Each structure stands twice: as structure tokens, then as C-alpha cells.
């Protein structure tokens, strides 16, 4: 179902560009990319909560699984949350930053807890890396209550 919606949205975009060039109206009534993403069942959405300051765990499990889960389509939507000591580790480690860039390019949503990032002096660097740094208590609670799957490392 989500593949059909994605193809419909992509097809509509191409058709819309062609029609715009000819002066006709684009597809109406099809869901936007945001609407299609929001229509996913919670069971198809994964939240990876990374809190550990252990580099080996990050490189050899957390980042590897999150990236492959998105690329291989094991989960339709992956949100990666950086919270606690992981914020400090990421802000100081170029190799982990490169891996995070791959995750961003794959379409993984990147978020971080601002309170923890500020404590470690990492908020600025995380923002530079494309991470949405914000209060995470309410968003994480909402993810859990809506039934998303949560993995914690």
C-alpha cells in the first residue's frame, strides 16, 4: 500500500511538472508526500533511541541497523533520536558524523534532546549535522503512545 502511494505521489509530481509547463492543473486529490508518510501504521514506524556513549556499540550495531532498516525497507519510517552521552560522542567523532550523514541521505528523521545536547555543549554541532535539536520528552512519549516500535541502545 505505501509503495503504491509513493509511486502515485512521484507520478503526480512528474505529471504536475509536465502539466505546469503546458498550463494545465496538476493532480488533485492524491496525498502529498507528507500525508503519505503520516498515513503509515505505527507498526511500520521505528524509533531508534540512542543514549549510549559507547562508540563500538554505535558503529557496529546502532548506526548499522538503523541505516540498513531504512535502505532495505524493513521499516517504512525510521526516526533516530540522540539522547544523553551519545550527543557528546557524535559531536566529537568524524566517522560517526559521516555515518549519520548517510542516514540523513537515506531519509531517516534525525532528532536530539536539547537539554542533554546543551549539557554536553553539542547542540550547535548536532544542528550543523542536520539534526532537529529540541525538547524530546513529549515527542518520545507521543511516539510510544501512538504505538511506534522503539529500540533503545
Where do the protein language model's features map onto the residues?
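Positively charged n-region of N-terminal signal peptides that target proteins for export
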Residues: 1-6
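A short aromatic-anchored loop/beta-hairpin motif
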Residues: 102, 111, 127-142, 149
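Signal peptide processing junction and immediate N-terminal pro/mature segment
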Residues: 21-34
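Histidine-anchored nucleotide/phosphate-binding helix
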Residues: 59-75
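Short internal beta-strands
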Residues: 66, 77-84, 110-116
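A glycine-rich helix N-cap at a beta->alpha junction
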Residues: 95-123
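Short, glycine-rich nucleotide/cofactor-binding loops
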Residues: 47-62, 86-91
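Bacterial N-terminal signal peptides
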Residues: 8-20
Amino acid at each position: 500500500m505505501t509503495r503504491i502511494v509513493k509511486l502515485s505521489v512521484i507520478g503526480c509530481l512528474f505529471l504536475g511538472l509536465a502539466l505546469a509547463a503546458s498550463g494545465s492543473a496538476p493532480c488533485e486529490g492524491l496525498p502529498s508526500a507528507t500525508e503519505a508518510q503520516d498515513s503509515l501504521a505505527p507498526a511500520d514506524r521505528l524509533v531508534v533511541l540512542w543514549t549510549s556513549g559507547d562508540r563500538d556499540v554505535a558503529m557496529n550495531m546502532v548506526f548499522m541497523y538503523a541505516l540498513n532498516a531504512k535502505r532495505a525497507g524493513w521499516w517504512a519510517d525510521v526516526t533516530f533520536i540522540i539522547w544523553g552521552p551519545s550527543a557528546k560522542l557524535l559531536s566529537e567523532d568524524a566517522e560517526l558524523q559521516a555515518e549519520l550523514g548517510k542516514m540523513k541521505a537515506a531519509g531517516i528523521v534525525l532528532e536530539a534532546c536539547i537539554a542533554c545536547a546543551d549539557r554536553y555543549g553539542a547542540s550547535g554541532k548536532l544542528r550543523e549535522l542536520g539534526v532537529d535539536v529540541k525538547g524530546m520528552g513529549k515527542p518520545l512519549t507521543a511516539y510510544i503512545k501512538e504505538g511506534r516500535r522503539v529500540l533503545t541502545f
